[in-house]
Amino acid sequence: MKDLLKFLKAQTKTEEFDAIKIALASPDMIRSWSFGEVKKPETINYRTFKPERYGLFCARIFGPVKDYECLCGKYKRLKHRGVICEKCGVEVTQTKVRRERMGHIELASPTAHIWFLKSLPSRIGLLLDMPLRDIERVLYFESYVVVEGGMTNLERRQILTEEQYLDALEEFGDEFDAKMGAEAIQALLKNMDLEQECEQLREELEETNSETKRKKLTKRIKLLEAFVLSGNKPEWMILTVLPVLPPDLRPLVPLDGGRFATSDLNDLYRRVINRNNRLKRLLDLAAPDIIVRNEKRMLQEAVDALLDNGRRGRAITGSNKRPLKSLADMIKGKQGRFRQNLLGKRVDYSGRSVITVGPYLRLHQCGLPKKMALELFKPFIYGKLELRGLATTIKAAKKMVEREEAVVWDILDEVIREHPVMLNRAPTLHRLGIQAFEPVLIEGKAIQLHPLVCAAYNADFDGDQMAVHVPLTLEAQLEARALMMSTNNILSPANGEPIIVPSQDVVLGLYYMTRDRVNGKGEGMVLTGPKEAERIYRAGVAELHARVKVRITEHEKRDNGESVENTHLVDTTVGRAILWMIVPKGLPFSLVNQALGKKAISKMLNTCYRVLGLKPTVIFADQIMYTGFAYAARSGSSVGIDDMVIPAKKAEIIDEAEAEVAEIQEQFQSGLVTAGERYNKVIDIWAAANERVAKAMMDNLSTEAVINRDGEEERQVSFNSIFMMADSGARGSAAQIRQLAGMRGLMAKPDGSIIETPITANFREGLNVLQYFISTHGARKGLADTALKTANSGYLTRRLVDVAQDLVVTEDDCGTFAGIVMTPVIEGGDVKEPLRERVLGRVTAEDVLKPGTADILVERNTLLNEKWCDVLEENSVDSVKVRSVVTCDTDFGVCANCYGRDLARGHLVNKGEAIGVIAAQSIGEPGTQLTMRTFHIGGAASRAAAESSIQVKNKGTIRLSNAKFVVNGSGKLVITSRNTELKLVDEFGRTKESYKVPYGAVMAKGDGAEIMGGETVANWDPHTMPVITEVDGFVRFTDMIDGQTITRQTDELTGLSSIVILDTAERTSGGKDLRPALRIVDANGNDVLLPGTDMPAQYFLPGKTIVQLEDGAKITGGDTLARLPQETSGTKDITGGLPRVADLFEARRPKEPAILAEISGIVSFGKETKGKRRLVISPVDGSDAYEEMIPKWRQLNVFEGERVERGDVISDGPESPHDILRLRGVHAVTRYIVNEVQDVYRLQGVKINDKHIEVIVRQMLRKATIASSGSSEFLEGEQVEYSRIKIANRQLENDGKVEMTYVRDLLGITKASLATESFISAASFQETTRVLTEAAVAGKRDELRGLKENVIVGRLIPAGTGYAYHQERARHRQQGEAPAAPQITADEASANLAELLNAGLGGNDD
């Protein structure tokens, strides 16, 4: 009995392990795994269906086919277990050992493992320092390779052709040793002395100077060191023994009709065994060399195909012309082991059905069809039936359930009570795609869903299906209830706003209920309270929209927690008073006292959550929904064709537009405008006409004239159904109404260009055939786009999740003082995002001071909640330094303070929260709403791009930042610096507007000047770039020789002559080295010095500059000396939407990036080459100058002799994030990526919190390149995980050694995912073969730190509720004791025993 118990325990035992290591398998290791050699290619006997002996399914090697029964049937039953039958040699045991027992094949000739040969860079090639071509020629028996040169002049590893080999044989006899095939490569690898080779390479590395050579050497050193450290031997990359997969993993299944379905692997193994046996026979017979060679080559190819079919040459195909699936194909790709079976599995206790509305459900409930519930909860029902004694055995209980006896339904009710189920709608784009509900049993076959959770699921009721899952264990039920219940997920994790918001009918009902009407029935009544309002409405004395006075009692919560009553008479409507009855105590009446649209309702719920907490909000949301539905039904809103009122002005607007178009057409025919201009103008005209029609229509729809009580006419907001739906935000938008009742407007061709004939009709009038045909383009493109978009968005989400999956909150506070400075996002004249929204829920990194004083307003390490944000706003704080995950100092993971508030819960984030995955979901989920197209800018948009002045909108004070300027003759400021910013500050010191001011702009007002709204502050010419003098004096030309460096041009109309500097290419040979410039001299002819320096004022003129002064002309500071014409950038395509977001996260370099100054210093231009000019920046302190070649066609923003700071823009263009990181640092690149990504989402009206994007940026910055290695064991130029560098440097500092220096790297998300420390995670993402090959050679250990690795090995993840378990394990590991094995109680043991005996007795009771 005792050993039976022990046996039972052994069956259920799981291995406890802390890490997984991958390495090369030595031949001895493969033999030790194996249970016997497979010698024959046969599978099973087709008559008896028994496996053939020594074949691929042999029972001797792999174990019995039936449980506890040997093959010949001599031993059966449990009592013989462990016996090996003497007749058929099969061990009597469970048949499941056929899933784990391996076999092996002894290869007659060694073969190379194709992964280490062909996976680039070729590991064998790198190790031997031989080109892949040569190695292949040796392996596939085309050439010889010298293994030992002996005393001859032949080098080791030299390749010999057949002829050369024969010649060498004649010359040297057996002095040397040359071989071909895998034996040769194996011998070379065996003879390598890794340590010595390493030493040699290190010496070479010291001596060499060339960059490419260094790179090559470092690569080899790294590989050799990996071999030495991991204990792998190079010759193990050549196989002499081939392992055979257990047979149940490559099954052979009989189909009806005597045929068999088999796994492709069996075919591949058969080929190997056949060729191997043939080769053995040929070797025994001592066959001619050429035949043996051919057979060896075929064996090599067979092994290649088995390991990775199609990697080399043509893929081996099966009988149906389809390539066979090799071992490598089994694990990679979407259908491979990782993604199909380890990361996502199908689960038991689940079902799916169509969803319908459940408007009467509470928020935490869902309707579950009885049929489904009965099936899903079967085990619980059986248990209950047995417990109650209603059924004696499980079998009897089964029968009762199948007969659906009355008592079963009662039991089902009991079982289901308080047992949450999880509902999931595919695609699950964020964590709110799976939520838990309490089931309510319903008749019918459709699941009923609460309408308010539809927004989170993105579900509608047009045939969507949802899946139900049952959490079985107590822990799972607890987690479902405490964490996943729909009532706990009121706020969206992406932006912290309510996601349980009413939409459509509910919004329309509430909007209708809270609207007011002039002269409604019962207007002017005075009521005692909401109760009376409802009474008179129900009695029909007053209507819903009547304006009345009502006595309202508000409850205000004080800071100390007590609530104060406050009663007064309010002007409101009957409907609003009725609605007030369901509003929870503690909210102000002003929330309800307005026409409630969707935004207002959302705000109301948000306020409720922040003020009163979760429970009242949930109840309130439900009440809102019931009320909304009720009054939507009352309102009887419907859409009729008469509701689409066409404006009377439409015809005349269209006639005007057509007249304008005709005029342009005439101009075009008489040659006054070009074809392009005509096209652009026509489109502009029609776009404007469309706007005018739309405006007329909306004015017409949105108000109506009524007679009030005094008999006068008054305008009030319209009660037109279509208008109400759009205005409340229930359905439809102004743009859609415009198509119904205005004009449809311009349409686009499939290629994205706009067709110039607009559709002047609308849907109410109806389209004619041509108009309909033009419309079809757009409609089809829309559908095609959507399909593409979904796939692209899904892939972006997958990459984001993969890069961020292992980021978890691991400690409370890392104590860093670093952070990022937050300011409001201001573009031109509008505040796009106020400071409040950016810092809400963040933690301050340093004390926030009251502006203009030294008083501390907010202490360091304060979580900024709504109250603190109010304080900041009252004191008009303009910038706050907050903690950020990018600057967090935690080694693995981040700390709670750097992350701030958990957006979905509204308090500081908990330890163990998987913030990486949340961030990835929040960014990826709205991906499908982004556009796919690149915007071609033409027509209206391109002309707006050339701005020439700044006009402010508000009144306030001007502030100029990093500005240099001179005052010109007329007393105006002229800007002479490159990146000047103009900010408009209001009287509280808050920035309201911000603009970039270009070089050469003339400012009407200076720094600190007061200004009124609407004033123009700065002017400039957008088409030329001026050269401006900073001093007074006289102009003196240098190196300006007519015909050599300049030419004179006279304007025919004005007769003015101007000088044009020739481009280097146009100059004669004499003028090539001359540098035309303007010097400024005083009256005595001495150089004038630039103010504050000892440099003479001289301005070098680049090619194509126009000078309109004569030599010796008198000038004053601020005058324009010369102008450089700027080509106005033509129509550039702006990448927008999803592709732009992907580009940013992949950190792709733009096509023509902006050129930034690498160091600070003085600009000069060196010798030019044919197509490029040489830019030299000389530092002021006289250290080495920096040179860079820049293509001639790039327009430069700097002149010779100007001073630039590191990171300044030298030539405009899109900035490359890598340059920003290198020259301006981590904060700048974070700010750049966050702002650029936010711009794309903001355009679509999607709100995402900045910190999610910062989380991804942190992951993109997780590698650094070592600049100098100090006393560490890292190599220079090696790319290492940033956390490892930090830990190593801390260690070095403690030991008093030299620390290493490093440069942070920015990796794109795909690269960063593949470069993670965990090979399991990387392999399950992309390029499985390459990742596994690299990991095996390096003998990598996976510490299983991330989420993905733990999911794959089937453990609790180190996040959320699994975080504690992992902490506990880590603690035990430090104390050096394993957690105690779970104790088995006596009851469990006897139950298990009964089960086992049943199995042993063959008692199948089905």
From Swiss-Prot:
Its EC number is 2.7.7.6. One of its GO terms (cellular component) is DNA-directed RNA polymerase complex. It catalyses: RNA(n) + a ribonucleoside 5'-triphosphate = RNA(n+1) + diphosphate. InterPro entries: DNA-dir_RpoC_beta_prime, DNA-dir_RpoC_beta_prime_bact, RNA_pol_asu, RNA_pol_N, RNA_pol_Rpb1_1, RNA_pol_Rpb1_3, RNA_pol_Rpb1_3_sf, RNA_pol_Rpb1_4. Zn(2+) 1 binds at C70, C72, C85, C88. Keywords: DNA-directed RNA polymerase, Magnesium, Metal-binding, Nucleotidyltransferase, Transcription, Transferase, Zinc. The keyword Isomerase does not apply. The keyword Transcription applies. One of its GO terms (biological process) is DNA-templated transcription. Mg(2+) binds at D460, D462, D464. Binds 1 Mg(2+) ion per subunit. GO terms for molecular function: DNA binding; DNA-directed RNA polymerase activity; magnesium ion binding; zinc ion binding. Zn(2+) 2 binds at C814, C888, C895, C898. Its cofactor is Mg(2+); Zn(2+). It is an enzyme of class 2 (transferase). SUPFAM superfamilies: beta and beta-prime subunits of DNA dependent RNA-polymerase. DNA-dependent RNA polymerase catalyzes the transcription of DNA into RNA using the four ribonucleoside triphosphates as substrates. NCBIfam families: rpoC_TIGR. Belongs to the RNA polymerase beta' chain family. The RNAP catalytic core consists of 2 alpha, 1 beta, 1 beta' and 1 omega subunit. When a sigma factor is associated with the core the holoenzyme is formed, which can initiate transcription. This is DNA-directed RNA polymerase subunit beta'. The lineage of its organism: Bacteria, Pseudomonadati, Pseudomonadota, Gammaproteobacteria, Enterobacterales.
